[in-house]
């Protein structure tokens, strides 16, 4: 993978679901919504001074949100931070850098 470039989209794994679950409260606070369903569908990664995870999350039958989560390097602060999100997405919308 090229540093700074986005990886290919991959199906979400249990680890990616855990990442999404950890930042769910941050997203709910920012959007002022509560999500009963919060299922990670696919993801891309971007290597920076840590890793950006771009995750497509299904929040309702036909509603999707793209979230961007930053994880710092282990020698730094490796906590997960929601750094961006895009609402109003569909199942077919491609994950892109934002």
Curated annotation (Swiss-Prot):
Keywords recorded for this protein, A-Z: Acetylation, Allergen, Cytoplasm, Protease inhibitor, Thiol protease inhibitor
Pfam families registered for this protein in UniProt: Cystatin (PF00031)
Cellular component per GO, a single term: cytosol
UniProt-annotated location(s): Cytoplasm
BP GO annotations: cell-cell adhesion; keratinocyte differentiation; negative regulation of proteolysis
N-acetylmethionine PTM positions: 1
GO molecular function, one term: cysteine-type endopeptidase inhibitor activity
Short sequence motif named Secondary area of contact, residue ranges: 46-50
Alphabetized SUPFAM superfamilies for the sequence: Cystatin/monellin
Marked site (Reactive site) residue numbers: 4
InterPro entries: Cystatin_dom, Cystatin_sf, Prot_inh_cystat_CS, Prot_inh_stefin
Disulfide bonds: none
Entry function: This is an intracellular thiol proteinase inhibitor.
Family listed: Belongs to the cystatin family.
Name of the featured protein: Cystatin-A
